[in-house]
Each structure stands twice: as structure tokens, then as C-alpha cells.
Curated annotation (Swiss-Prot):
This is 2-oxoglutarate-dependent dioxygenase thnC. Belongs to the iron/ascorbate-dependent oxidoreductase family. Pathway: Secondary metabolite biosynthesis. Binds 1 Fe(2+) ion per subunit. Fe cation binds at residues 199, 201, 258. Its EC number is 1.14.11.-. It is an enzyme of class 1 (oxidoreductase). SUPFAM superfamilies: Clavaminate synthase-like. 2-oxoglutarate binds at residue 268. 2-oxoglutarate-dependent dioxygenase; part of the gene cluster that produces the tetronate natural products trihazones. ThnC catalyzes the oxidative decarboxylation of trihazone A to trihazone D. The C4 hydrogen is first abstracted by the iron-oxo species generated in ThnC to give a tertiary radical at C4. This is followed by decarboxylation and removal of the second electron by the FeIII-OH center to give trihazone D. The pathway begins with the formation of trihazone A by the hybrid PKS-NRPS synthetase thnA and the trans-enoyl reductase thnE. Disulfide bonds: none annotated. Keywords: Dioxygenase, Iron, Metal-binding, Oxidoreductase. The keyword RNA-binding does not apply.
Length: 320
């Protein structure tokens, strides 16, 4: 295969979810294992999430971001101890970037009644919109992609020869975060400005829905030293591994840099669900790992300068 022919594999998960032969599940496990080893990314069809729900989610996303700016700012994630809510354009910038991201975003997670463990658990912030226009479809979608993220973790464990029994403790009370994103039209983006600058995801499994026909995601190919454009296909998800998976798998699964550039005229919408595991869970990708570092400890190191993490919260996750 020439460099020009390189593309992310498209894997059909239906062979794992509803196998028709004794080999179907193992074939999917091996395909996902190989994709995560070679690319750290793959595309996924046959995932079981209705396309009607995907479209409802994207419609709800559009409704949210079309609200007046002053109404959106009332939902600011900076006012929330769990960092749930709205992020305005220009508020994210990574070290080395010339300009901040052009995207707008809205964050939500598990719906817990009180703030616990450094803000990783707690209540969401919901806009004042009719239930059927936002909260209903968004929450249903969150639950569906949460289940899909868990399934991918199960496959990753089996790809390294471990039993899915390890998921019982790992998924006891999982940290699952979701991010709704709107990228502005290229016509209103500054020259050289990215929708999202180059970065690695920091945690576990990412489940990404792209608005069909609105390309923008690019993945870095280290061997070829080039960016690979990932097409935005209808009813096809993009799955990738974060830094936690790469570390815990001993590098057998990759975490790879990626970025977003809106390449088509008009807005571009997407939604990413991040499945990390229980805050007190340790490494299921290597049960014999002597480090015994927990999900919470890893995420605190990543977030301690972004979230309102106080001494009590650090002690709760064993990081004090």
C-alpha cells in the first residue's frame, strides 16, 4: 500500500455485538487490536446507535449553540466545580499554539446529585430549553455512547488476552464525559487558526460523531510524518485511544496527535464521548501493574490546573 492509499480502517462492530459464527467476535477483537496498535484510531460501523438518535443529537447541538451569547454565558463551565457547561470560542489554547481554538463547546457528564472527588462526579448544567429539544435526546445519546465506550474497553482488554471480568470493578461508577462542539465557518476563522489545535486525548476511549460530509479531523502519521484526513461518514464513528490507554497498555495501544480544521463552508458540528473508568479503578490492561495508579490520580494530574481541585478532593482520590 502506498502512502497515498493509507486510511483508517472501518471496522464493523456487529460481528462482536451479534456474532453469526464462532469466529466473528474474535475477528472484531483482532481488527480493533491491530488498528489501535498501528494507528491509535479506527472508524466504526455496526455500532448499534440509531442514526435517528445521532441526527436528533446534532439538531439539539445546533439549537444550543444558536442561543444568544449572553444566555450561553450564563451556563459557563468556569462557574461550575465540575467544569460542566458552556465554553466560548477562543477559551482553549495549548502550549505552542499561535492562536486559541475557534470552537465553541458544551460539557456534560454523569448526572450525580452532589459534587464529589475533585468535581469528577456531580450535577450537569442544562440550558433553559424544552426537554424534547435538548435534554431528552442529549441524555439518551449520552447513555448510548457510554455503553459503546464500555464495549470498546471490553474489546481492548480481550485484545491483550484479558477477561472482560476485569470490567466489573473498572466500570463500577465510570467517569464518562461528553463534549458537544461547534466549529465556525472558515470564512470567519482567522488565517492559521484551528478548530482544535494538535493534541492527544489524555484518558481512555473516545467515541466521536462527526457531522456527515463535514470533513475536518486530521490524524498524525508518525512514520510518514504527515497528517491524514479522516472523512466524516454518515453513521460511522471515529474511535481513538487516549494517553491513559497507551501508558497502561505499555505502548501496545497508541495515543496519537490529532487536530480539527473546518474544511467546508458553513458550521461544522461534532460530539465526543470520553470513557475513562471508575475514579478508584486501577489498570485493567495490565492487572499485574505494580504502580496501582488509579483513574482518578491520572486525571487529577491532567486537570489540577483547570478544575477547582482542593486539598479534600485530592485526598479523596489519593493524590495528596
Amino acid at each position: 500500500m502506498s502512502e497515498e492509499d493509507i486510511s483508517l480502517p472501518i471496522i464493523d462492530l456487529s460481528g462482536y455485538l451479534s456474532p453469526k459464527s464462532p469466529d466473528d467476535r474474535q475477528n472484531v477483537i483482532e481488527q480493533i487490536r491491530d488498528a489501535c496498535r498501528d494507528f491509535g484510531f479506527f472508524q466504526l460501523k455496526g455500532h448499534g446507535i440509531p442514526i435517528s438518535l445521532q441526527k436528533e443529537l446534532l439538531k439539539s447541538l445546533g439549537t444550543l449553540f444558536s442561543m444568544p451569547k449572553e444566555e450561553k454565558m450564563k451556563l459557563s463551565y468556569l462557574e461550575n466545580p465540575c467544569r460542566r457547561g458552556y465554553e466560548a470560542s477562543g477559551m482553549s489554547m495549548r502550549e505552542g499554539d499561535a492562536m486559541p481554538d475557534s470552537k465553541e463547546a458544551y460539557y456534560l457528564g454523569r448526572e450525580d446529585p452532589v459534587v464529589e472527588f475533585s468535581g469528577f462526579y456531580g450535577p450537569n448544567v442544562w440550558p433553559n430549553l424544552p426537554e424534547e429539544d435538548f435534554r431528552g435526546p442529549v441524555w439518551e445519546y449520552y447513555q448510548k455512547t457510554s455503553q459503546l465506550g464500555k464495549t470498546i474497553w471490553e474489546v481492548l482488554l480481550q485484545g491483550l488476552g484479558y477477561s472482560t471480568d476485569l470490567m466489573e470493578a473498572f466500570a463500577k461508577r465510570p467517569l464518562v464525559q461528553m463534549k458537544l462542539i461547534r466549529y465556525p465557518s472558515p470564512s470567519v476563522t482567522l488565517p492559521g487558526q484551528f478548530g482544535v489545535g494538535a493534541h492527544n486525548d489524555f484518558g481512555g476511549v473516545t467515541v466521536l460523531l462527526q457531522q456527515a460530509g463535514k470533513d475536518g479531523l486530521e490524524v498524525w502519521l508518525e512514520k510518514q510524518q504527515k497528517w491524514l484526513s479522516v472523512p466524516a461518514l454518515e453513521d460511522v464513528y471515529v474511535i481513538n485511544c487516549g494517553d491513559m490507554i497507551m501508558k497502561w497498555s505499555g505502548g501496545r495501544y497508541k495515543s496519537v496527535r490529532h487536530r480539527v480544521i473546518n474544511k467546508t463552508e458553513g458550521e461544522r458540528h461534532s460530539c465526543a464521548t470520553f470513557w475513562h473508568g471508575d475514579v478508584f479503578a486501577t489498570n485493567p490492561l495490565n492487572p499485574e501493574d505494580p504502580n496501582k495508579e488509579t483513574v482518578g490520580q491520572l486525571l487529577v494530574k491532567r486537570f489540577r490546573h483547570q478544575m477547582s481541585i482542593h486539598k479534600e478532593g485530592l485526598a479523596q482520590v489519593g493524590e495528596l
